[in-house]
UniProtKB/Swiss-Prot annotation:
Residues 109-170 are annotated as: Disordered. Keywords: Ribonucleoprotein, Ribosomal protein. Residues 131-150 have a biased composition (Basic and acidic residues). Belongs to the bacterial ribosomal protein bS16 family. GO terms for molecular function: structural constituent of ribosome. The keyword Ribonucleoprotein applies. This is Small ribosomal subunit protein bS16. GO terms for cellular component: cytoplasm; small ribosomal subunit. Residues 151-170 have a biased composition (Low complexity). The lineage of its organism: Bacteria, Bacillati, Actinomycetota, Actinomycetes, Mycobacteriales.
Length: 170
């Protein structure tokens, strides 16, 4: 049985995505595959090329013939050079740079805006000195009120004592 390593297309219109599959050469393009060994997304920047190198080496070793587009992908990943024993087995595959985290972006913007990283609140705090001045008059106002409350309390026991004496006299 003639076995080919070929691209099976899937994805939306004008957004092609491919599976790199091992299939019988007589099967149609998107037909039944023996094994899927990778994927290829040409519309990404840079293109996503993922090939299971171990499985590709196995299928090339048992005689599977890659189609021309798959051969180019195998050269980019370095699997073809490894199979043939040629120099350059590391390949020329480009990797996407990792995106910076949102926390790093926020800290950078904060440092740019204020001149240094700060974990404090972004709004300025109110000064406490005027608040202390306001507290002193309220304490003074509270003292006379306490004195006034103490006076009726002092009179109340005297009245209670006077009442207790009055019934005893009768």
């Amino acid at each position: 049985m003639a076995v080919k390593i070929k691209l099976a297309r899937f994805g939306k219109i004008r957004n092609p995505q491919y599976r790199i599959s091992v299939a019988d050469a007589r099967n149609r393009r998107d037909g039944r595959a023996i094994e899927v060994i990778g994927r290829y997304h040409p519309k990404e920047d840079p293109s996503i090329i993922e090939i299971d190198s171990e499985r590709a080496q196995y299928w090339l070793g048992v005689g599977a013939q890659p189609t021309e587009p798959v051969l180019q992908l195998l050269k980019i990943t370095g699997d073809w050079q490894k199979f043939k024993g040629l120099p350059g087995a590391e390949g020329t595959l480009k990797h996407k740079e990792p995106k910076p985290s949102k926390l790093d972006l926020f800290n950078a913007a904060l440092a740019e805006a204020e001149g240094g990283p700060s974990t404090e609140a972004t709004t300025p705090k109110k000064k406490k000195a005027p608040a202390k001045k306001d507290e002193q008059p309220t304490e003074k106002a509270a003292e006379p009120a306490a004195e006034k409350a103490a006076e009726p309390a002092a009179e109340a026991p005297a009245e209670a004592a006077a009442e207790s004496e009055a019934p005893a006299a009768e």
